[in-house]
Amino acid sequence: FDKCNDPDYIISSISDFILLLNKNSRAACMPIAGSLADATSSQTMSWITGFPSRVKFNGKSFFHDRSICDSQEIIRNRNTDLAIHISTVNHNKVELNDKIKNIFIGHINSTFNIKPDIFIPVGNPGIDHRGIMFRTDNVVSVLLDKIREIELLSTQDVMNMLSEVDNL
């Protein structure tokens, strides 16, 4: 793409080809994304099985444990002692569990049923910072641009800082 004079034409051609294939079969265009292609893996699993990545394959069938990632059940069964909540867009009241420690990274105007142990306010993607928004099935993405200047860090900045602390 870097050396192409018209990268939009390439994307348009790929999209047209996928539409043509979908007349008689099933096809999708999925990006190779994430540091270890984790976004690609999730999209492919959703496309092929209808389930997210947490699938166990057994011969010609598969098993999906829908409770393995159920945060409410994990907290209720005391399988964790810490929850990290990330919510940069929605500032509605967040229900935190008082039986565990809670770290909240998110919208500066967020409200809570109880005070989080740590609250890190961050900017909104597409308003305060550039970013990418994925449709809930992870198949479609939209590039978000920054439209205002604000002193808040992005969620990515916070995560990068936390990963650097871990490497000390």
Give, region by region, the residue ranges found by the protein language model:
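Low-complexity, serine/threonine/proline-enriched polar segments
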Residues: S42-Q43, S53
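Small-residue-rich helix-loop
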Residues: D38-A39
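Non-catalytic alpha/beta scaffold blocks inside enzyme catalytic domains
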Residues: F1-A27, G34, I48-L168
